[in-house]
Amino acid sequence: MDGVTVINHPLVQHKLTFMRRKETSTAGFRRLLREISTLLCYEVTRDLELTVETIETPMVEMEAPVLEGKKLVFASILRAGNGLLEGMLDLVPSARVSHVGVYRDHETLQAVEYYFKAPESLSERLVIVVDPMLATGNSSIAAVDKLKERGAVNLRFVCLLAAPEGIKNFREAHPDVHVYTAAIDSHLNEHGYIVPGLGDAGDRMYGTK
């Protein structure tokens, strides 16, 4: 599918299966989400630019590659996006962080924005937007809209699960933003939830209803 990468790594798929199971505990779900996020981060950042600095090993001085972390921003769509954010920051602790507060109105299924905070100079940074679910796509579209309004031009979107409807809507709204996902599920139900899915990621992560 154009503009979409499905990450089929065996460890990702194995852990995703355990996250889908309805009997998985809140603690287990949260742990698995953090573990998967590190694997997704590995894939989505494989082409990040490196710079060189001079270091001393126990043997000699050498020129060695290091990541330009200050050029990277992780943008979490609250609240469930924080589950992906934590694992990614484990790998790139020097990255900047943005939070976009958007929730889906359960009656209209439209996105409602309530919070936004981002680093300066977004136009100079790669912005990786994270949210476990790409369902209708409305919340993700709204979040990327806001980031672009603040100057972001180089963005990627990372999720655990995506519905075909959400991918279609998101790609139509933001054809310049590549989507990375662990799986593309069958469809959305009448309530806008991904089927077979894994339920509400935020509720399962935080033990709420």
From Swiss-Prot:
Belongs to the UPRTase family. The lineage of its organism: Bacteria, Pseudomonadati, Pseudomonadota, Alphaproteobacteria, Hyphomicrobiales. Binds 1 Mg(2+) ion per subunit. The magnesium is bound as Mg-PRPP. GO terms for biological process: UMP salvage; uracil salvage. CDD domains: PRTases_typeI. Uracil binds at residues 194, 199-201. NCBIfam families: PRK00129.1, upp. Catalyzes the conversion of uracil and 5-phospho-alpha-D-ribose 1-diphosphate (PRPP) to UMP and diphosphate. 5-phospho-alpha-D-ribose 1-diphosphate binds at residues 79, 104, 131-139, 200. The gene is upp. This is Uracil phosphoribosyltransferase. Its cofactor is Mg(2+). Keywords: Allosteric enzyme, Glycosyltransferase, GTP-binding, Magnesium, Nucleotide-binding, Transferase. InterPro entries: PRibTrfase_dom (IPR000836), PRTase-like (IPR029057), Upp_B (IPR034332), UPRTase/APRTase (IPR050054), Ura_phspho_trans (IPR005765). It is an enzyme of class 2 (transferase). Its EC number is 2.4.2.9. It comes from the Bacteria. It comes from Allorhizobium ampelinum (strain ATCC BAA-846 / DSM 112012 / S4). GO terms for molecular function: GTP binding; magnesium ion binding; uracil phosphoribosyltransferase activity. Pathway: Pyrimidine metabolism; UMP biosynthesis via salvage pathway; UMP from uracil: step 1/1.
